[in-house]
A protein has these predicted regions:
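Flexible phosphate-sensing "switch/lid" loops adjacent to ATP/NTP-binding sites
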Residues: 46, 51-429, 435-437, 444-450, ...
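C-terminal and late-domain segments of enzyme folds
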Residues: 522-651
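Short, hydrophobic alpha-helical segments
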Residues: 195, 300, 332-340, 476-480, ...
Length: 651
C-alpha cells in the first residue's frame, strides 16, 4: 500500500510539473484517449493542484519568482576588469532595490586560493566562514556590501573533488563518470544551489545571481565551465540568463586606430562554444568611435544599444556610474524581464567624486614582502582608500619592499636601501601587513622600530603585529635573540609560537581562519573607542602563529598592552603601545571587512593619526555622536566639525 501511495505521489508531481512548465499533457500520457483527457481537464487540474500542495510540492505557486542569472565572461587577454564589471553590475541592480549575490568561477585545479603565492594570483581573500578565496570575492563584498561563503568560489579542484567523492560513494550507480554530463551537471547544480543562499542578512533567496567566469574564453581550463553554462542557459530559460562579455579594443600605431578584430575573434570562440553574448563591454583607453561601435555590433551580432564602452577611469567607483550613463541596467533588466526601478546611487556618486576632489595629502608607507604585484595587497589598498575618503584626505601609498630596509640590502644595493629608508622617513604613517616566511621579516622589524622610536603612527596586521612584538621583546625587554619559531625554531625567547591546533604537514585550510570574536580587556585604549565602545568585535583571521602567552606579562610590564583577546582570554588579538600617538597592531585582518561606506576602524585610526585628527574622532563626545548617527554619517569628520567637536588637523 505504501509503495502504491509513493508511486501515486510521484505520478501526480510529474503531471503537475509538466503542466506548470506548459508542456502538453499528451507528452506524458501518450496513446491515451485525448477526448477523455480534454473533457476532464478542469477537474483533473484542480485535483492535481490540491494533491501537489498537500504533498508539499514546491511548484504549487505560479507566482514564485525564478532566479535571474547574469554571467560575465572575458576574452582577448586576462586582467581586463571582469571582476570590477561584475561588481558594477551588482551595484546597479542593488541600486534598483534588487537583492544580489555573486559567484566566481576559477578554472584552476587548486581547491582554493589558500596555498597560492600572492605573486601567482594576487591576495588570498578570507571570508567569514574561513573560506580562502579569489580576490574578486573581495570586490563583490565591498561593492555590494554582502557577505559571501566559501561555496561562492567555484574551482576546478572543488568540482572534481566533489565528483570523485560521489563516485567513491557509488552515487553514479556504476556509470562511467565523464566530463559530460557528470562534471557539467555538478557545476550547474553548484551554481543553482549557491545562488539561493542569502548574503545580505535578510531572509529568502536573492533576486539575481551574478556569475563571473574566470580566465579567458578559449582557455582549455575553462571549457567544462563554458559547456556547463551553455547547458545552464536552457535549464533556467533564456529570459533568466544574461551574458555580458568583456573584451579589449586595443589602439595600434601612432595614429591611434582602434582595432576590433581581437574582440571579433573572442566572440567567435564564445559563439562556437554555444554561448551568445547579450551585452558586449569593451575595455579601451579612450572612448570608442561611433564607426567602431557599429562595426562591433555588425560582426559580433550584438545590438548597438547593448555595447558598452568602459574606458580607463581615475578610480573604479566611477565604473558603475559609467555603465548607468550608457543604460546598461535597463538593457540587463529588460533582457531578464525585470521591472526597471529608480536607482539610488547618490552615496556612490558622492564617494566617486570625493576621491577625485580631496586635495590634502596623507602618505602611508606600506612595508611588505610582495610589493612587486599590487594585487598582493588589494584589500589593504581598498581599506586605506575607504578610510582616506572618510578622513577627507588624499591618499598616497609609499610601497616599500621590506628586504630593502635590512642592513644586508645596503651591502648588496645601497641605492635601493637609501631609497627605501627615504620613503619610510617621509611617510605620515606606517603599515606592516601580513605575510608568511622569514624573507623580509628583519626589514619589517626595522619599520616597526622606526615608528615606535619616532612616534610615527603604526598599524601592524597579522605578521605586522608579530614583528612589532618581537622587536619590542628585543629592544625594550632586552631579549636580543627573541624571535618567532616560524623563522627560528631554536630561539631561547620565542615571542611568537606555533598554535597547537595547527598542522605542519597539510597547508591548505589548516590555519585559524574566518571570523572570530575579539573581546576588549579594558576601556582605556584607543581601539575600543575606534570600534564605537563595543565590548567585542568579530574580525577575520588567517594565521598559524600567535604571540607567546608566557611572555605577555613581561611585555605588558614594559608598556606593550594586549587590550584585545579571544573568547578564552589566552590568545592575543590587539596590542597597543602606551605613551605613543598611535601604535596599534592586531592579529586579525581588518582589511577584509572594510567597506566604502563603513571603513575599518583600525585603518581609520591609522589615517586619522597620520593626519592629526585622531583626538577629535575618539573623544567621548565624538564617539557618542558616531554611535547615534550610525550609517547616516556619510562623512564622519565633517559631522564632527559641524558638531563643534573638531580639535586637530589642518585643511
Amino acid at each position: 500500500m505504501r509503495l502504491r501511495e509513493k508511486k501515486t505521489r510521484v505520478l501526480l508531481f510529474r503531471v503537475y510539473t509538466i503542466r506548470v512548465e506548459q508542456l502538453p499533457l499528451s507528452s506524458f500520457f501518450e496513446g491515451k484517449n485525448s477526448k477523455f483527457w480534454n473533457s476532464s481537464y478542469i477537474l483533473f487540474e484542480l485535483f492535481v493542484r490540491v494533491c501537489c500542495c498537500r504533498l508539499g510540492a514546491s511548484s504549487c505557486s505560479n507566482d514564485e519568482q525564478k532566479m535571474k542569472y547574469v554571467v560575465v565572461s572575458g576574452g582577448v587577454v586576462s586582467g581586463l576588469g571582469k571582476g570590477v564589471t561584475a561588481s558594477s553590475v551588482g551595484v546597479m541592480l542593488s541600486a534598483a532595490d534588487y537583492r544580489v549575490t555573486h559567484i566566481k568561477i576559477d578554472p584552476y585545479i587548486n581547491v582554493d586560493a589558500g596555498t597560492m603565492s600572492p605573486f601567482e594570483h594576487g591576495e588570498t581573500y578570507v571570508l567569514d566562514d574561513g573560506g580562502e578565496s579569489d580576490l574578486d570575492l573581495g570586490n563583490y563584498e565591498r561593492f555590494c556590501d554582502i557577505n559571501l561563503t566559501r561555496d561562492h568560489n567555484i574551482t576546478t579542484g572543488k568540482v572534481y573533488q566533489s565528483v570523485i567523492e560521489r563516485e567513491r560513494e557509488g552515487k553514479y550507480l556504476g556509470k562511467t563518470v565523464q566530463v559530460i554530463p557528470h562534471v557539467t551537471d555538478e557545476i550547474q547544480d553548484w551554481i543553482e544551489r549557491v545562488a539561493h543562499i542569502p548574503v545580505d542578512g535578510k531572509e529568502g533567496p536573492p533576486d539575481v545571481c551574478i556569475v563571473e567566469l574566470g580566465g579567458t574564453v578559449g582557455d582549455i581550463e575553462s571549457m567544462p565551465f563554458i559547456e556547463a553554462l551553455r547547458q545552464f542557459q536552457f535549464r533556467v530559460g533564456p529570459e533568466n540568463f544574461c551574458l555580458v562579455h568583456v573584451s579589449l579594443v586595443p589602439v595600434v600605431g601612432s595614429v591611434g586606430e582602434q582595432k576590433t578584430k581581437p574582440t571579433q575573434h573572442s566572440i567567435q570562440a564564445l559563439r562556437s562554444a554555444g554561448l551568445a553574448p547579450t551585452m558586449l563591454a569593451c575595455r579601451s583607453s579612450s572612448a570608442l568611435d561611433k564607426a567602431v561601435m557599429e562595426k562591433l555590433a555588425l560582426f559580433c551580432h550584438v545590438s548597438p544599444n547593448n555595447i558598452l564602452n568602459l574606458i580607463d577611469v581615475s578610480n573604479i567607483w566611477h565604473v558603475p556610474l559609467i555603465m548607468v550613463e550608457q543604460k546598461a541596467h535597463l538593457a540587463i533588466l529588460g533582457h531578464l524581464q525585470m521591472k526597471p526601478r529608480p536607482l539610488k546611487l547618490e552615496a556612490w556618486k558622492h564617494r566617486a567624486e570625493k576621491w577625485d576632489s580631496v586635495h590634502v595629502p596623507c602618505s602611508i608607507a606600506v612595508v611588505g614582502k610582495y610589493t612587486g604585484l599590487g594585487d598582493s595587497y588589494l584589500s589593504v589598498t581598498k581599506a586605506l582608500m575607504h578610510s582616506s575618503i572618510a578622513c577627507d584626505r588624499k591618499l598616497k601609498i609609499l610601497w616599500i619592499e621590506a628586504e630593502d630596509l635590512e642592513e644586508e640590502s645596503k651591502q648588496a644595493n645601497e641605492d635601493k636601501y637609501d631609497e627605501a629608508w627615504a620613503k619610510l622617513k617621509r611617510a605620515d604613517g606606517v603599515l606592516v601587513p601580513g605575510g608568511f616566511g622569514g624573507r623580509g621579516v628583519e626589514g619589517k622589524m626595522c619599520a616597526a622600530k622606526y615608528a615606535r622610536e619616532n612616534e610615527i603612527p603604526y598599524l601592524g596586521i597579522c605578521l605586522g603585529m608579530q614583528v612589532a612584538v618581537i622587536e619590542f621583546a628585543r629592544n625594550v625587554c632586552g631579549h636580543a635573540d627573541a624571535h618567532s619559531t616560524e623563522m627560528d625554531p631554536t630561539t631561547e625567547h620565542p615571542a611568537v609560537i606555533f598554535m597547537p591546533e595547527g598542522s605542519k604537514t597539510h597547508m591548505g585550510g589548516t590555519m585559524r581562519l574566518g571570523a572570530r570574536e575579539t573581546i576588549f580587556q579594558t576601556k582605556e585604549c584607543v581601539s575600543w573607542r575606534l570600534y564605537g565602545k563595543k565590548d567585542a568585535v568579530a574580525e577575520r583571521h588567517r594565521h598559524r602563529y600567535e604571540v607567546n602567552p608566557e611572555m605577555v606579562d613581561e611585555l605588558e610590564q614594559k608598556g606593550l598592552h594586549f587590550v584585545g583577546k579571544d573568547e578564552t582570554g589566552t590568545r592575543m588579538e590587539i596590542c597597543e603601545l602606551a605613551n605613543h600617538p598611535f601604535f596599534v597592531a592586531c592579529q586579525y585582518h581588518p582589511e577584509f571587512k572594510s567597506r566604502p561606506g563603513r571603513p575599518s576602524p583600525m585603518f581609520m585610526g591609522l589615517l586619522l593619526a597620520a593626519s592629526g585628527q585622531l583626538e577629535s574622532y575618539v573623544s567621548d563626545e565624538a564617539v557618542e555622536l558616531r554611535i547615534s548617527m550610525g550609517n547616516m554619517m556619510r562623512s564622519p569628520i565633517k559631522s564632527i566639525k559641524a558638531a563643534g567637536l573638531y580639535v586637530g588637523g589642518t585643511d
